[in-house]
């Protein structure tokens, strides 16, 4: 049963059988709500906590009354352009009261610029877009655990009270049923000592508290204190060893540790969890521990020891909570405020009371620094992944267990990383990185939301047990609430009234999957896709893919490069519109009205209220990852527009739907070994018609600074450079927009002053006669790096004179943007949505590709062996359905007769998509495969027609494009959605002739970024040894590596066309000799005729030659000057020793003379 639904402007035919009962929430609300809470509540809460600040005498009081955020100085676009932070000034109203005089001063104090969140849930920090990732941490509260003591096999129990900030309190038992307590991770004490210290002085009172429990009696026997005072002193000795204990200091220590709100904070969530776990009802406002908490915690531990309690599972999502932007910011702001508080107190005592004002007291530096540090360098403040809209969206919904106060990769075991039953509907079981972070970083599920305590909730439909009806009432449940109920699956069949059709249904209870009678069911899932995240919900036929491959599919969609021509998938899941809409890359109408004017970069809407709305579109901007951000209008003049409607497509969107790749005709067959190891064979048509062409924009910057020798200058006048090289530079020396550049071309001409050399008398005379010659400068222009090329699309110039804010010491800053059009090429990585990835091995002429009976050449050939062992069958079903929907006539679906309008788009939602039968029916309706239309000219007409009749549905006979012969077997063909991933061969290919060498080892540097060489490692040396390739090996170990003299002479010989000389001694060999000598071995090198070979330092002529040839043989020029060395820096070791000895000798002689 297939029916049409509207996905934005486009119609899709969906196979979903389950009606959606609720709309999906806004997908970035986790960021927005949290930040809104911070601005409205979080800030106020902190000022309330810190206020009032009193001096040590209690005479001066500083109160924070109210705060207000001003207007930001620049818009979001301007901030990106100027490299500044998108922030608003925070002003706080402060009151200073002098108790002696009764004087009250009120003032508004500026407390720094506070970064604001953009509409898209991001922050602009120093011009870069960043995202604050939510952190999954253990919730404050009380936790019980049990373990087995290995020798005795007895169960041991423990309890831990974890605060949001403050000292931990831990209880534990031993094999003799003693109960011990640890305060703040110190040595353990009998728990009764703590109970006495709380004011229950004698044994009778302690026994009475716990109804004379036997285990308390056993513990009392070990307790050598008699009353409260002794107990306090005993605790003080453990916490402050070496200090003289007094009862008062001990009492105040215990008070501050657990009962002082300033030093101990359970937070709202900690109090809620403790009350819930221990079944007590302390006021929600009391955020420190109370006596009742501690007594109740011990009672619960005793129950556990008797065998009628339960231990807690720390990986359960009821015990882990999220710290989102707001809370992370609040914690950081609190650190800044507490530092400021210290400064205020100090200033209160120092300053003169008469002239003191709030402004004088408050130093905002610590607050500003704390915020800046958080946004700039916290592990959770991340550079936004902006490869495509899905990458942006997923980044904002990411949940990380790493970061300050969280886990570390090394410490995290298997249990923490594993999928847990409480993840259902809250955290996606599929989407997580491969590699060391697996399971520590997750993604929020589609319908999940965060409650006030930071726990993740998921929606369920309430079942009315009286009437046996599934109602439309939606309840959001946290993980520990859900464990109490029995929850039916979303695919349980219901009738019109909402009653279950069957007597027994599949349901979940805790971690059990049960088949239960309908009467027992409490709740029902709202949607089949509530289990998975956005990226996973975009994979059609997910239910037919192995989880490991689905994980790769979900992750690789985030790496798809936005293409020049977008194309939404034929086979989607119905999520494409929502994902693109909420990612914020499309332009959305703010008000309803009619389109008055549309151009490439602006849309004007005449609104219903008579005003005109201008929508500026983003044109060819660079994203964080160097991909291209470009918006193009999808509305036309005179069109009616509603508020919230998409009026322009962004990158990777097509008619408002997410479009990460292209629909291509694929065939699953082997072809001449070109599909070996998942390689992909591609039709040249995809290159010619720009199917997978993308635009990449690189940014280069050049600044002129003040140096010791004078200012650098950006200019067209560069020494020793011909006019040919300068042809594209303007009169300022900056390249013009539209110029095509190649590696080594000058982008910005810049000269730096050279040090003036000492002049001889003759030169000074000539200078005096002929006037001052132009000062010495060297060329330090910005050039296009190796392997880069393209067109200049934008140039931005910032300078001090124009009043731009630049870094200290910088006078002018030039930014140049180079755009490249990258067509698909061999070595590029491509993938489908099912984890089926591969590298392009060959691009073939269209005429040579296998073709269908109607003459259509296949566009991509994939290896069939990549499917069975990987168990991602979803790709095959997608291929069949894609083929059918491409050829489906819309009229056949609506009225049952052809209308000539070919090609529809379908949606097959996850866990509720098309079945095998649906696909067969669809293929038949679309009239595939078309055996009877083939115009056969072959002699084997009849036999072929018979074999075509036997071709199963969804397959076709293919013909070899080179010979025209049919292939032996029918082959699966159809349309698959393929993505081009951000691992492009242009970014990886690299070659080096000569280049930089490491100063220490004299060997070439490594890596493309350093223009380095390829490492020829130990195993590669073995390979050459095995072949006996002695000369190749010698060359690799000497002149191609660290034989400093040899490589210069070899280079010279090649340049001059002479024979290559014998290699010399590598630098590493000299080090080896020195190391052996340092072990006390007398090692010499002898030649064949047993003469000792002296190892010399670099000769002067070698260095000179190198200079002439323009190669930097060493990081610095260490060749000595003729005659006596001017300073010890320029000598080798032996000379240095001689020099020092001589110097000492002279000094001694002088002393003797005195």
Swiss-Prot record:
Biased-composition ranges, Basic and acidic residues, are: 1108-1123
Disulfide bonds, which pairs?
Answer: none
Q: Please give the superkingdom of this protein's source.
A: Bacteria
Chain intervals for the UniProt region annotation (Disordered):
1108-1136
Q: Which reaction does it catalyse?
A: RNA(n) + a ribonucleoside 5'-triphosphate = RNA(n+1) + diphosphate
Pfam families recorded for this chain?
A: RNA_pol_Rpb2_1 (PF04563), RNA_pol_Rpb2_2 (PF04561), RNA_pol_Rpb2_3 (PF04565), RNA_pol_Rpb2_45 (PF10385), RNA_pol_Rpb2_6 (PF00562), RNA_pol_Rpb2_7 (PF04560)
CDD domains recorded: RNA_pol_B_RPB2
- Using the UniProt record, name the top-level EC class of this enzyme in a single word: transferase
Q: What EC number(s) does this enzyme carry?
A: 2.7.7.6
Q: What does the record give under GO molecular function? A: DNA binding; DNA-directed RNA polymerase activity; ribonucleoside binding
Q: Any idea which UniProt keywords this protein has?
A: DNA-directed RNA polymerase, Nucleotidyltransferase, Transcription, Transferase
Compositionally biased residues, Acidic residues: 1127-1136
Task: Give the GO biological process terms.
Answer: DNA-templated transcription
Q: Under the cellular component aspect of Gene Ontology, which terms does the record hold?
A: DNA-directed RNA polymerase complex
Q: Function of this protein?
A: DNA-dependent RNA polymerase catalyzes the transcription of DNA into RNA using the four ribonucleoside triphosphates as substrates.
Subunit text: The RNAP catalytic core consists of 2 alpha, 1 beta, 1 beta' and 1 omega subunit. When a sigma factor is associated with the core the holoenzyme is formed, which can initiate transcription.
The record's annotation in HAMAP family points to: RNApol_bact_RpoB
The UniProt similarity line reads: Belongs to the RNA polymerase beta chain family.
Q: Which PANTHER family match?
A: DNA-DIRECTED RNA POLYMERASE I SUBUNIT 2 (PTHR20856)
- Protein name, per record: DNA-directed RNA polymerase subunit beta
Q: Name the species this protein comes from.
A: Heliobacterium modesticaldum (strain ATCC 51547 / Ice1)
């Amino acid at each position: 049963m297939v029916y049409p639904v509207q996905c934005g402007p486009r119609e899709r035919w969906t196979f979903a059988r389950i009606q959606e009962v609720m709309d999906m929430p806004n997908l970035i609300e986790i960021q927005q709500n949290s930040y809104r809470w911070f601005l409205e509540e979080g800030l106020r809460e902190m000022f309330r906590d810190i206020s009032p600040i009193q001096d040590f005498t209690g005479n001066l009081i500083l109160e924070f009354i109210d705060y207000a955020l001003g207007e930001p100085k620049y818009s979001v676009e301007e901030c990106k352009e100027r490299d500044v932070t998108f922030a608003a000034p925070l002003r706080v109203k402060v009151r200073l009261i002098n108790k002696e005089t009764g004087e009250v001063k009120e003032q508004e104090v500026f407390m720094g610029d506070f970064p604001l969140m953009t509409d898209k849930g991001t922050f602009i920090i120093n011009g870069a877009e960043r995202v604050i990732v939510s952190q999954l941490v253990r919730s404050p509260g009380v936790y019980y655990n049990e373990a087995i003591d290995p020798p005795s096999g007895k169960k041991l129990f423990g309890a831990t009270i974890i605060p949001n900030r403050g000292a931990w309190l831990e209880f534990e038992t031993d094999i003799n049923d003693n109960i011990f307590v640890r305060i703040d991770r110190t040595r353990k004490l009998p728990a009764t000592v703590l109970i006495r210290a709380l004011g229950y002085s004698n044994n009778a009172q302690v026994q009475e508290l716990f109804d004379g429990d036997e285990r308390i009696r056993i513990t009392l026997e070990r307790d050598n204190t008699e009353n409260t005072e002794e107990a306090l002193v005993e605790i003080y000795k453990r916490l402050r060893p070496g200090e003289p204990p007094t009862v008062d200091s001990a009492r105040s220590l215990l008070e501050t540790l657990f009962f002082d709100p300033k030093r101990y904070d359970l937070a709202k969530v900690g109090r809620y969890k403790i009350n819930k776990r221990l079944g007590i009802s302390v006021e929600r406002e009391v955020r420190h521990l109370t006596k009742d908490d501690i007594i109740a915690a011990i009672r619960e531990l005793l129950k556990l020891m008797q065998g009628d309690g339960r231990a807690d599972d720390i990986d359960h999502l009821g015990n882990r909570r999220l710290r989102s932007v707001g809370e992370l910011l609040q914690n950081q702001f609190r650190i800044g405020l507490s530092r400021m508080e210290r400064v205020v107190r100090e200033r209160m005592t120092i300053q003169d009371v008469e002239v003191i004002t709030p402004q004088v007291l408050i130093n905002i530096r610590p607050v500003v620094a704390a915020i800046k540090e958080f946004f700039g360098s916290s592990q959770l403040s991340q550079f936004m992944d902006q490869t495509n809209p899905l990458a942006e969206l997923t980044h904002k919904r990411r949940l990380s267990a790493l970061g300050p106060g969280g886990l570390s990769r090394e410490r995290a075991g298997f249990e923490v990383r594993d999928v847990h039953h409480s993840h259902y509907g809250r955290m996606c079981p599929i989407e997580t990185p491969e590699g060391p972070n697996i399971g520590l970083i997750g993604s929020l599920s589609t319908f999940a939301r965060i409650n006030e305590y930071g726990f993740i909730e998921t929606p369920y439909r309430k079942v009315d047990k009286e009437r046996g009806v599934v109602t439309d009432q939606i309840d959001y449940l946290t993980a520990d609430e859900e464990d109490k109920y029995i929850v039916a699956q979303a695919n349980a069949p219901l009738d019109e009234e909402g009653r279950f059709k069957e007597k027994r249904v599949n349901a979940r209870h805790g971690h059990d999957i049960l088949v239960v009678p309908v009467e027992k069911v409490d709740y029902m899932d709202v949607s089949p896709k509530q289990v998975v995240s956005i990226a996973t919900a975009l994979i059609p036929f997910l239910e037919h893919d192995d989880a490991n491959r689905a994980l790769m599919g979900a992750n690789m969609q985030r790496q798809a490069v936005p293409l020049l021509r977008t194309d939404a998938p034929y086979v989607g899941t119905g999520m494409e519109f929502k994902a693109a809409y909420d990612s914020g890359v499309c332009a959305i109408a703010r008000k309803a009205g009619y389109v008055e004017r549309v151009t490439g970069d602006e849309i004007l809407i005449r609104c219903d209220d008579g005003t005109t709305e201008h929508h500026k579109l983003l044109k060819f901007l660079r994203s964080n990852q160097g991909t291209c951000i470009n918006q193009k209008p999808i509305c036309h003049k005179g069109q009616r527009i509603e508020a919230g409607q998409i009026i322009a497509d962004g990158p990777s969107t097509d008619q408002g739907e997410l479009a990460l790749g292209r629909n291509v005709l694929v065939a699953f067959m082997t072809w001449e070994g070109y599909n070996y190891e998942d390689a992909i064979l591609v039709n040249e048509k995809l290159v010619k018609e720009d199917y997978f062409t993308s635009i990449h924009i690189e940014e280069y910057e050049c600044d002129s600074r003040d140096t010791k020798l004078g200012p650098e200058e950006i200019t067209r006048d560069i020494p020793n450079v011909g006019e040919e090289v300068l042809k594209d530079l303007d009169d300022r020396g900056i390249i013009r927009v539209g110029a095509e550049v190649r590696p080594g071309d000058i982008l910005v001409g810049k000269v730096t002053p050279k040090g003036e050399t000492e002049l001889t008398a003759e030169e000074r005379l000539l200078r005096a006669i002929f006037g001052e010659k132009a000062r010495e400068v060297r060329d330090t222009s910005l050039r296009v790096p190796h392997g880069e090329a393209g067109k200049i699309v934008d140039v931005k110039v910032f300078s001090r004179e124009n009043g731009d804010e630049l870094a200290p010491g910088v006078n002018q800053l030039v930014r140049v943007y180079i755009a490249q059009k990258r067509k698909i090429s061999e070595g590029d990585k491509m993938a489908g949505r099912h984890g089926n990835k591969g590298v392009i091995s060959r691009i073939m002429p269209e005429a040579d590709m296998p073709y269908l009976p109607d003459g259509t050449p296949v566009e991509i050939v994939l290896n069939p062996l990549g499917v069975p062992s990987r168990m991602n069958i979803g790709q095959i079903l997608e291929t069949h359905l894609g083929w059918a929907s491409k050829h489906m006539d819309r009229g056949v679906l609506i009225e049952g007769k052809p209308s000539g309008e070919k090609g529809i788009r379908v949606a097959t939602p996850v866990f509720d998509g098309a079945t095998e039968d649906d696909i067969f029916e669809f293929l038949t309706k679309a009239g595939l495969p078309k055996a009877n239309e083939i115009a056969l000219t072959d002699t084997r007409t009849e036999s072929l027609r018979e074999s075509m009749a036997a071709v199963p549905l969804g397959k076709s006979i293919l013909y070899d494009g080179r010979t025209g012969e049919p292939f032996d077997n029918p082959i699966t063909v159809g349309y698959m959605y393929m993505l081009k991933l951000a691992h492009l061969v242009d970014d990886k290919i690299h070659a080096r002739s000569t280049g930089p060498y490491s100063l220490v080892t004299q060997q070439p540097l490594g890596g493309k970024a350093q223009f380095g060489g390829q490492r020829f490692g130990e195993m590669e040396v073995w390979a050459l040894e095995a072949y006996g390739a002695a000369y190749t090996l010698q060359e690799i170990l000497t002149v191609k590596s660290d034989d400093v003299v040899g490589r210069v002479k070899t280079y010279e010989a090649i340049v001059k066309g002479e024979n290559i000389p014998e290699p010399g001694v590598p630098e590493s060999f000299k080090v080896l000799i020195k190391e052996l000598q340092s072990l006390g071995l007398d090692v010499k090198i002898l030649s064949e005729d047993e003469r000792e070979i002296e190892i010399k330092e670099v000769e002067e002529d070698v260095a000179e030659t190198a200079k002439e040839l323009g190669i930097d043989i060493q990081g610095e020029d260490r060749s000595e000057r003729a005659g006596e060395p001017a300073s010890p820096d320029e000598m080798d070791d032996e000379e240095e020793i001689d020099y020092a000895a001589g110097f000492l000798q002279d000094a001694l002689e002088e002393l003797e003379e005195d």
